[in-house]
């Protein structure tokens, strides 16, 4: 196997692992009746760690483009999990905050995700 083939195989295996993890998370969320996509979870997880951040910052943290993130935030707002507020220094800069329902959701979802990480670590 050449060096180029090894690098390609490593990238493919990394992608397969990521896809398997993503599917495992989605199965667990569905099993526990949490109506949330993996992409929504990425955004919510960022906000559970620090809310009141800009869409630009969320885009960087989640590796999502602006259009995709806008759509995700719109959907999260429809579920009443997040709210956009004007930034204090620039009214055009919208900051994203959790609603009380979004904060409460963490009590259900975070333990599920922690269990997935624990199980994954135990299997390695």
Segments and roles (model prediction):
Residues 43-44:
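Short alpha-helical "packing" element that flanks the helix-turn-helix/winged-helix DNA-binding module
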Residues 55-56, 67, 74, 94:
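Residues within helix-turn-helix
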Residues 59:
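The alpha-helix within a helix-turn-helix
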Residues 74-124:
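Charged, amphipathic alpha-helical coiled-coil/dimerization segments
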């Amino acid at each position: 196997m050449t060096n180029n083939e090894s690098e390609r195989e490593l990238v493919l295996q990394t992608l397969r692992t990521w896809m398997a993890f993503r599917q495992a998370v989605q199965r667990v969320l569905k099993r526990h009746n949490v109506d949330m996509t993996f992409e929504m979870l990425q955004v919510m997880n960022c906000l559970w760690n620090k809310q009141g951040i800009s869409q630009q910052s969320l885009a960087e943290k989640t590796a999502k483009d602006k259009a995709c993130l806008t759509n995700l935030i719109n959907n999260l707002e429809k579920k009443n999990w997040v709210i956009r507020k004007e930034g204090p220094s620039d009214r055009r800069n919208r900051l994203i905050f959790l609603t009380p329902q979004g904060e409460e959701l963490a009590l259900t979802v975070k333990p599920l995700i922690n269990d997935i990480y624990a199980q994954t670590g135990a299997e390695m």
